[in-house]
């Protein structure tokens, strides 16, 4: 089953557009986990198990694992999701951006080592930086387009032949680069007008939307701007607001409650 097939099935099965981001910061873990060697895996797996029926995808951020020499725990986490919660796609948030043999190795890392179902990619270097990932026909490739950070406007709003750079990325990603139908785009919840513009350009191409929760993006504006005609088309990511909802041994239950509330808030506007 391809990433897009999994995503479509998860949207329907779980009645959810929520993506839970897995950005584990041990400094914020409950005290009972802090001394354990595999605390990053244990924390993330508990969050996953508590929320898997409420989400359309999970998105581990590779830097949070690599910075603590915990890549083996990331491998174990993705394997855990695939084994215990089959059908929920895993997006490796790596934002790689290179070309040629280096990009090929990054694709091997994402899809063969970590066995992610999709990966985020920086398309700044053009099609050469995307093609190595598209060589895996069952995998998803999610390109940065209009990012949620304020500084994104420094480049993404530059005029390129009568359109903004982020619009050009959207046009390429939904057109000539996407003959295999594997590409999705990152568009930040902090900019709902741009979400609507990207949706206008790309049709039903899925959008990964960070920026709700701790970053302050508005759920109603996001959903109304980005939903497709059938009320799907979005992976609306929340990380910190869910991960760190609880401070004690019941942290996973607290995370579930916030995830449930977030999913239901999203569904109000579908």
Curated annotation (Swiss-Prot):
Active site as annotated: 95 (proton donor)
Enzyme Commission identifier(s): 4.1.1.23
Gene Ontology annotations of biological process type: 'de novo' pyrimidine nucleobase biosynthetic process; 'de novo' UMP biosynthetic process
UniProt cross-references to Pfam families, sorted A to Z: OMPdecase
Biochemical pathway: Pyrimidine metabolism; UMP biosynthesis via de novo pathway; UMP from orotate: step 2/2
Matching CDD domains: OMP_decarboxylase_like
Reactions catalysed according to its record: orotidine 5'-phosphate + H(+) = UMP + CO2
Keywords: Decarboxylase, Lyase, Pyrimidine biosynthesis
SMART domains, A to Z: OMPdecase
GO molecular function: orotidine-5'-phosphate decarboxylase activity
InterPro entries the UniProt entry points to: Aldolase_TIM (IPR013785), OMPdecase_AS (IPR018089), OMPdecase_type-2 (IPR011995), OMPdeCOase_dom (IPR001754), RibuloseP-bd_barrel (IPR011060)
Record family assignment: Belongs to the OMP decarboxylase family. Type 2 subfamily.
Name of protein: Orotidine 5'-phosphate decarboxylase
Organism: Dechloromonas aromatica (strain RCB)
Gene name as annotated: pyrF
């Amino acid at each position: 089953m391809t990433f897009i097939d999994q995503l479509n099935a998860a949207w329907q099965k779980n009645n959810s557009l929520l993506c839970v981001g897995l950005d584990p910061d041990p400094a914020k873990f409950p005290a009972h986990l802090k001394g354990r060697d595999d605390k990053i895996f244990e924390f993330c797996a508990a969050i996953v198990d508590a929320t898997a029926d409420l989400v359309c995808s999970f998105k581990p951020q590779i830097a949070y694992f690599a910075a603590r020499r915990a890549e083996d725990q990331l491998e174990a986490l993705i394997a855990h999701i695939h084994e215990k919660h089959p059908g929920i796609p895993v997006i490796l948030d790596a934002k790689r951006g290179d070309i040629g043999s280096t990009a090929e190795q990054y694709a091997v890392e994402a899809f063969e080592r970590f066995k992610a179902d999709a990966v985020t990619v920086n398309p700044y270097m053009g099609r050469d930086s995307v093609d190595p990932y598209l060589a895996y026909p069952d995998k998803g490739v999610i390109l940065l387009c209009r990012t949620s950070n304020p500084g994104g406007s420094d480049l993404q709003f530059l005029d390129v032949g009568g359109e903004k750079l982020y619009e050009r990325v959207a046009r390429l990603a939904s057109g000539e680069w996407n003959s295999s139908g594997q590409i999705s785009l990152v568009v930040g919840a902090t900019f709902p007008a741009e979400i609507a513009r990207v949706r206008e350009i790309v049709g039903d191409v899925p959008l990964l939307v960070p920026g709700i929760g701790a970053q302050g993006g508005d759920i109603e504006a996001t959903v109304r701007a980005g939903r497709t005609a059938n009320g799907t088309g979005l992976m609306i990511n929340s990380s910190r607001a869910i991960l760190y909802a609880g401070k004690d041994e019941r942290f996973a239950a607290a995370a579930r409650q916030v995830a449930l509330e977030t999913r239901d808030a999203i569904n109000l506007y579908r």
